Amino acid sequence: MSWKRNYFSGGRGSVQGMFAPRSSTSIAPSKGLSNEPGQNSCFLNSALQVLWHLDIFRRSFRQLTTHKCMGDSCIFCALKGIFNQFQCSSEKVLPSDTLRSALAKTFQDEQRFQLGIMDDAAECFENLLMRIHFHIADETKEDICTAQHCISHQKFAMTLFEQCVCTSCGATSDPLPFIQMVHYISTTSLCNQAICMLERREKPSPSMFGELLQNASTMGDLRNCPSNCGERIRIRRVLMNAPQIITIGLVWDSDHSDLAEDVIHSLGTCLKLGDLFFRVTDDRAKQSELYLVGMICYYGKHYSTFFFQTKIRKWMYFDDAHVKEIGPKWKDVVTKCIKGHYQPLLLLYADPQGTPVSTQDLPPQAEFQSYSRTCYDSEDSGREPSISSDTRTDSSTESYPYKHSHHESVVSHFSSDSQGTVIYNVENDSMSQSSRDTGHLTDSECNQKHTSKKGSLIERKRSSGRVRRKGDEPQASGYHSEGETLKEKQAPRNASKPSSSTNRLRDFKETVSNMIHNRPSLASQTNVGSHCRGRGGDQPDKKPPRTLPLHSRDWEIESTSSESKSSSSSKYRPTWRPKRESLNIDSIFSKDKRKHCGYTQLSPFSEDSAKEFIPDEPSKPPSYDIKFGGPSPQYKRWGPARPGSHLLEQHPRLIQRMESGYESSERNSSSPVSLDAALPESSNVYRDPSAKRSAGLVPSWRHIPKSHSSSILEVDSTASMGGWTKSQPFSGEEISSKSELDELQEEVARRAQEQELRRKREKELEAAKGFNPHPSRFMDLDELQNQGRSDGFERSLQEAESVFEESLHLEQKGDCAAALALCNEAISKLRLALHGASCSTHSRALVDKKLQISIRKARSLQDRMQQQQSPQQPSQPSACLPTQAGTLSQPTSEQPIPLQVLLSQEAQLESGMDTEFGASSFFHSPASCHESHSSLSPESSAPQHSSPSRSALKLLTSVEVDNIEPSAFHRQGLPKAPGWTEKNSHHSWEPLDAPEGKLQGSRCDNSSCSKLPPQEGRGIAQEQLFQEKKDPANPSPVMPGIATSERGDEHSLGCSPSNSSAQPSLPLYRTCHPIMPVASSFVLHCPDPVQKTNQCLQGQSLKTSLTLKVDRGSEETYRPEFPSTKGLVRSLAEQFQRMQGVSMRDSTGFKDRSLSGSLRKNSSPSDSKPPFSQGQEKGHWPWAKQQSSLEGGDRPLSWEESTEHSSLALNSGLPNGETSSGGQPRLAEPDIYQEKLSQVRDVRSKDLGSSTDLGTSLPLDSWVNITRFCDSQLKHGAPRPGMKSSPHDSHTCVTYPERNHILLHPHWNQDTEQETSELESLYQASLQASQAGCSGWGQQDTAWHPLSQTGSADGMGRRLHSAHDPGLSKTSTAEMEHGLHEARTVRTSQATPCRGLSRECGEDEQYSAENLRRISRSLSGTVVSEREEAPVSSHSFDSSNVRKPLETGHRCSSSSSLPVIHDPSVFLLGPQLYLPQPQFLSPDVLMPTMAGEPNRLPGTSRSVQQFLAMCDRGETSQGAKYTGRTLNYQSLPHRSRTDNSWAPWSETNQHIGTRFLTTPGCNPQLTYTATLPERSKGLQVPHTQSWSDLFHSPSHPPIVHPVYPPSSSLHVPLRSAWNSDPVPGSRTPGPRRVDMPPDDDWRQSSYASHSGHRRTVGEGFLFVLSDAPRREQIRARVLQHSQW
């Protein structure tokens, strides 16, 4: 029946999904049970395996210390003995003779289960449960048992009442209450109902399984109307309780039924109690979901068991002595059953959140129950407390042996009552009775007494591990048993059995989740467990008590205490009881805490682990108590959270026991140990840091028994949530200093507090991470299994987090060496945890993320230490950083915050945004940083907005400290208004002068750079950025200068968030700040402070401390903000653009300041700042300055200029919001740089005089081109795929100088607009980058290299992307960047002389064929002008290889190949930042959004006609399908041409910008993207005056931002670009096919031939988004001006 195939199992086909598998190495092989010829014990072996593997049962049974012993016929004693063997024995095959004998004696009168005679496994299973009930609750009847410690009734029994309600007359029959241990269903009815359901519904779903079972169970069970109205009504069954283990017995018509396959296929792995019965009255039952964990099968008169072993997340097959691993999925079991013709008899569904039974009934029982539930073993859902007290039960069995004379009758009575609805009611009844009478006390009691103390722990652990596996066999054994076994199996796999494992699963989820995620569960358990942790041994005890009520726990406490103590002491002492009281106290506390906190906090994974650990706890309680006095407290802390886990760490033997192969048993007794053994290090990595670090790191896990370990895990989770450092101190203090009782008391209090804190923090972390450690339901058994495996992982992760947190604190305190040591330790722990996380993809990702962050932090610390060694600049950043946030030291931005941010400590991020931003940026791992940013995003946006200047200033201050001059700080203070922003920028200019030199110095030695010439400074800044990327310390020195410039910008912008937002008032300022590129991708979306911070970071060119800080904060802010609110992102982007524009003006500000009056207008206050030589400023100032500010404090002027340009960029369509896009600032910068270049020309004449308006600055036709391009692009709304990374950048938006916001195309919606702003920001950034390159970033070339570029400004972004990459970016464009760097270095002076666009410098690489190909690919759908500048516009596309070698860096930058998603913030600093990417993104290439999501550029779509406008010189781009159009001045859209013709161009520009932004190291390339004016035809860029006029002329409301590549990356001299003949080796000047990228490899031809011929595309390229009329006007002007 195909319909049956896994239809009802759905995604939860196997429990493993629910439980995180523990490393198989940590699990000892599952033990088989012998079945010698003639014994015919397979039915018993199957039932026994199921019981053992059911975590709930195993753990609950361990908790039971007292029972009514029946001597030789005591089934309880026999079970205790076998469980002890499971847990402790090293034998692979164990005899079940004792239990078989006790069972036979118990049911001797009934002649059932007699020796040598085969019997029914389901009946055996049910009777064993009833006998257990008799032994532990002899005074109660089977059907009326209310004992809290009765595993059978509390975990397995279904309290039902039947009633008939007539639908016609409404008559109702008297309710018939009854209890059943097994819910029997006819397989025939099951198949029939399944067919009917499938006929009624198109698709079967896993949720239908419960309904299917309900229908099948009542099928044909029709009753007459109670009022005899003649109606035949179906009986209704109402479930009154919430069993954690549901046993479904399948009744077969034949031993060789042909329905076997159909039945197996119809089985579901998830069962909802609400679906199974007509109605459920218990709220828990309504919500509980049980998972198939075990199945007893029958075939050929032989029983075998399948059980899901949560430890290894695999289904195990138990065939007596043979144990085989089936697979992780339920389908694997189905396959085997079909092949083996197995008939499922018992299905065991366990609640992953199930907990051990409460032993409150017993003197220790009350405590026991709470504790049991708290320490749910995930698999031991049924009567879990008893199971949990398994080992303890063994010891308690000795301690409290009592025989219940009426056990037999009770069992019998209960069996019949419970089976009221069961088909085998009578038989079951007798079986139950007999088994109770004879079985439990016989073997179990004897064994229990002798082995309970010693073997109880071991056995428990082993038992817990094996219960699952062996449970598998029992399942296979009998129909009834099978059903139950499946449940148990499922639950253990899940973390607990379905019925009683619901709570345990929750606990397990919480526990595992906590372990995995800062151990919140541990925290909840830690309240109890933390105290235990403090005591080392006490924790396990406490944990078992949590599981065990006081009564049961009494004995278990003794055994647990001794066990936990021995565990703590590395000795397994199952019988140690000295600390019983402490253990009890701890247990009580753990019980409460875990119930309250653990469940919530624990994720499915945690829960399972917790469950397993809990069983161990009872086993370890003695050792806990022993350790209770000493290490036990520490472990106690840990213990509550993760007793089992801790035990694993503590004792290899315990680990082995846990390794018994049964996760449930391991959790109970050996599973926790196994988990710890395999994952102890990984778990400890995170857990120890909090518990171990504070409390003596090692002891916490080493000395905590398994149970204690579970508590510890919980505690650690809580502590971790509360704070790594926080949990640490507690554990450390309690471990050694206090007596057991004192420590216990303190631990209880601490655990309560820690659990709460950890819960809250875990919730926060979870919220930030989007991970729910305790999901309401598990997707499948596999998930539950994963949960189980995460125990050790959780611990390791928490320890690592704790250590890392300490490292951050030390770093903040300035102790970099100690911080580095701790960071390395955290890295090692994270690596261990990574192994533990192998079970879960999420866990793996989490650990990997944190590992990357830690690695980056370590690198940043190393860099910082290096910086401190060369304290010239670092000292300044340090000074500034303290000003910003005491937490961050010079490189603080890199050091402390990353992890905090990752921890999603939004509050911290907010308070220490700058610091955290930097750290985040530096440590920015694609996921972690973004997560951090996500958490930061809202906060940082608001806080930054609130105090952007302060945050940004702080960041800038720290950055600038080294390079900052008074003027720089003044600039910081200056920003009081948009105008002031520019002034500040100019102020920054002054600092830039010094910082620029510093940048150079920084580049060289971090301290002397600021004294290098501005150009040098830029180049050095780039290089330093590059170096800083390599060496966080270097970035820090560079950063200061930039910080200064940016600070001014940020301050002005930040002083009034409105300034950032209100960059409209600062038209020039609102342009993207080139400095931003690093952080821009993140910060762009952030408020000004963040943006500024990013700018500062970019400006400081990876000023590691600031860079990391800013980037992190901004990135965090950005990531969440961008995805969540594009509008916010856009506004942030705009703010950032303004800031970046300011910073750019600061960086390029000197140039602009000296070059453009327009820029100067806004930055007039800073005009006083000494402008760099006009030539230099022009040549490389825009980008050089940007780089400078990015790289050094002296770049601020450049940034100011950038700011001015930013306004232009915004005017040209880059909204500030765009700037917020990581790479958008870059787009803004290119425009800014263009303007700067033009202004620089003007400034040459005007110096700081009045810089023409941005509109006038650019050549008219360039502007027109840009306008059209923007227009068309906006129309198309198809930004380049490359731009996609920064959605804001993706859209090409031209904003009018007077307008802050991008002029959105009428058809754009807000999202499109936002995306466009992002794209435009990217585009403008690219333009600015081009300008920067054009400006003459000869020295920046190094930085501009994909690597060097990444190393510098882009390095910042990339660093954010990969904080661990202190060196050059590792992108494929690295080579290009290197070439670019060299070219830029060479071309800096060239670019400087270049009037508007120094294209010679950047043209080689930029326009190389390969580079153009890349650009074309990334910019597919965008027009690549054939002109050399056009390639600049779209750095991705290659211009003629020889003539217009686009700077490789630029291309790369634009190409989306760079991992921009992670480091969306692309440096807009200069062409050098552009990572050359040979590949061209196809128009359809999905651009990674700033949120890290691949998205098509907003405007890009296959429907959009894409064409590359290749320069006449023969630049052609290959790899992208572009409309074959060659853009030359003739081909460029004229006034008569439709705007659409420009859409591709603008799109190209946008894409280029986007790509640049997208590509962390490709920012400069963006500049090329924007440069349309470049033409091989010798289109001469209008004189500076022309450009200035163009920009300045008020007649052009849409301010076109000519992208002047100030940096050497775009250093192709303007004369080369405009006047120079085709570069040698370049393709023919004639039009190129747009659809075919050049064949030449940009690397070869571009670099080889045109390193000297790079043309600054930004020179003449204006990216303008304006109304059609204005665009037409602009075009007309451009045409007139350039006379195309």
From Swiss-Prot:
Residues annotated as binding Zn(2+) 3: 166, 169, 225, 229
Transmembrane segments: none
Binding-site residues, Zn(2+) 1: 67, 69, 74, 77
Modification type Omega-N-methylarginine: residues: 12
Coiled-coil positions: 736-770
PANTHER family assigned: INACTIVE UBIQUITIN CARBOXYL-TERMINAL HYDROLASE 54 (PTHR22975:SF5), UBIQUITIN SPECIFIC PROTEINASE (PTHR22975)
Purpose: Deubiquitinase that specifically mediates 'Lys-63'-linked deubiquitination of substrates with a polyubiquitin chain composed of at least 3 ubiquitins. Specifically recognizes ubiquitin chain in position S2 and catalyzes cleavage of polyubiquitin within 'Lys-63'-linked chains. Not able to deubiquitinate substrates with shorter ubiquitin chains. Mediates deubiquitination of PLK4, maintaining PLK4 stability by reducing its ubiquitination-mediated degradation.
Biased composition (Low complexity): 386-399, 558-571, 659-674, 866-878
Chemical reaction(s) catalysed: Thiol-dependent hydrolysis of ester, thioester, amide, peptide and isopeptide bonds formed by the C-terminal Gly of ubiquitin (a 76-residue protein attached to proteins as an intracellular targeting signal)
Protein family membership: Belongs to the peptidase C19 family.
InterPro entries found in the cross-reference section: Inactive_ubiquitin_hydrolase (IPR052398), Papain-like_cys_pep_sf (IPR038765), Peptidase_C19_UCH (IPR001394), USP_dom (IPR028889)
Name of the protein: Ubiquitin carboxyl-terminal hydrolase 54
One Pfam match: UCH
Biased composition (Polar residues): 511-529, 720-730, 884-894, 1155-1176, 1205-1223, 1334-1352, 1433-1442
Entry EC number(s): 3.4.19.12
Signal peptide start and end residues: none
PROSITE patterns, per the entry: USP_3
